[in-house]
Amino acid sequence: INACFSSAGCWVALDRVRDPGNLGTILRTADAAAAAGIILIDDCTDPYSVEAVRASMGAVFNVCLAQATASEFSNFCQIWQGSVIGTALPASNDYRQADWSSPLVLLMGNEQAGLSEEMMGLCTQLVRLPMKGRSDSLNLAVATGICLYEMLKV
């Protein structure tokens, strides 16, 4: 994992993402937003599955991919010189108020469970995306895209 981080910028770390459509959409959005790459933590779906490749519209071949266990990612966060921004429903900070300057890792959790307590503990900032309507959360790929484009404002 350390070898991938020779370039600064924004990395996206995905913890236990299961849906290949979500992963492909995140890959496509990360490519469009010029993210430095994607870190797949623990048991993520295969980025080279037919559905993920299709959803990525081929962006899977343009984005640097790294695989890490939760333990490896945790060890990496201890020496990482940048921010780790995680999204979590219980967070009190609005994503628009976060410090999105590089270098940073955007840490996104599993579709059903979100970020584990362990992963939240690795974050230098925890943010939420406010829900104005009746829905209590957004699709993982949509939430990731919103955060990536907020990062582009910096």
Placement of each model-derived feature along the sequence:
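RNA substrate-binding interface of SAM-dependent RNA methyltransferases
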Residues: 1-91
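Short, solvent-exposed loop/helix junctions and linker helices
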Residues: 17-20, 101, 137
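Structured adenosyl-cofactor binding patch, chiefly the S-adenosyl-L-methionine
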Residues: 31-33, 46-60, 117-154
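Glycine-rich loops and low-complexity Gly/Arg-rich segments
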Residues: 36-39, 62-66, 89-92, 109-112, ...
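Active-site/ligand-binding-proximal alpha/beta "capping" segment
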Residues: 85-135
